[in-house]
């Protein structure tokens, strides 16, 4: 049986090659190693501690997935304008991804699917272990006005 697929895009010089997530891992490593509840105002500590414990459990369980991976969008929902945090223009790549893929939301707070509305609008994180679910990769031609 042929798997169901969704068209996706990614803005990156490296295309769909998984990248080490050093910037994003800093937050996880903070929760794993450096978190100190006494750094927060006393009236917020109960809530912050509760959130920290929820994140900590999730981060420990999925830490390997967060090491290497890629960020992508569902085709038709984002364009280069949405990437104004990038310092320079990067190429756009397109591909197809199997719908049964294991994904994470962009904030690394939960596992999700391609139908997650937050992900449809904000993008997804795909761990390197799931890269084999991407097919028909090609660089998208620029549609600059002449």
Region annotations inferred by a language model:
Residues 2-22, 27-39, 43, 50, ...:
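Active-site and NAD+-binding cores of ADP-ribose-processing enzymes
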Residues 34, 45-87:
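Extended catalytic/binding region for NAD+/ADP-ribose chemistry, centered on the ART fold
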């Amino acid at each position: 049986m042929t798997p169901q697929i969704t068209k996706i895009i990614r803005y990156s010089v490296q295309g769909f090659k998984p990248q080490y997530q050093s910037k994003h891992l800093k937050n996880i490593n903070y929760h794993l190693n450096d978190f100190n509840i006494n750094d927060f105002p006393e009236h917020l500590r109960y809530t912050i501690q509760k959130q920290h414990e929820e994140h900590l459990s999730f981060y420990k369980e999925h830490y390997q997935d967060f090491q290497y991976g890629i960020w992508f969008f569902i085709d038709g929902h984002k364009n280069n304008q949405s990437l104004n945090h990038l310092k320079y223009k990067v190429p756009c790549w397109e591909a197809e991804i199997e719908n049964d893929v294991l994904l994470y939301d962009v904030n690394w707070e939960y596992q999700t699917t391609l139908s997650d509305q937050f992900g449809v609008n904000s993008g997804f994180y795909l761990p390197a272990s799931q890269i084999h679910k991407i097919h028909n990769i090609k660089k998208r031609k620029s549609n600059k006005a002449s």
